[in-house]
Amino acid sequence: MANLCEICGKGNNSGASVSHSNKKTKRKWKGNIQKLKAMVDGRPKKVKVCTQCIKAGKIERAF
């Protein structure tokens, strides 16, 4: 299962670290993905959601 937000699709981004001498090495930026229980179709289900979607209230949490 991929490390993606099930609401907005946010995941990992790739790019380069650039040193002072302008050497470049590949690196990744990881999205802040959390596992939580949410109400999906009226039932609690474990989903992976990014923190921006949690803060924006795009998911109804199941307690």
Swiss-Prot record:
Keywords annotated in UniProt: Ribonucleoprotein, Ribosomal protein
GO molecular function terms noted in the UniProt entry: structural constituent of ribosome
Entry annotated with the keyword Ribonucleoprotein: yes
One of the protein's GO biological processes: translation
One GO cellular component term noted in the UniProt record for this chain: ribonucleoprotein complex
Cleaved signal peptide residues: none
Composition bias type Polar residues, residue spans: 11-20
Region (Disordered), start-end ranges: 11-30
InterPro entries membership: Bacterial_rp_bL28 (IPR050096), Ribosomal_bL28 (IPR026569), Ribosomal_bL28/bL31-like_sf (IPR034704), Ribosomal_bL28_bact-type (IPR001383), Ribosomal_bL28_sf (IPR037147)
Extent of Basic residues compositional bias: 21-30
Gene3D superfamilies for the chain: Ribosomal protein L28/L24
NCBIfam families: L28
Family named by the database record: Belongs to the bacterial ribosomal protein bL28 family.
Name this protein carries in UniProt: Large ribosomal subunit protein bL28
Species in which this protein is naturally found: Natranaerobius thermophilus (strain ATCC BAA-1301 / DSM 18059 / JW/NM-WN-LF)
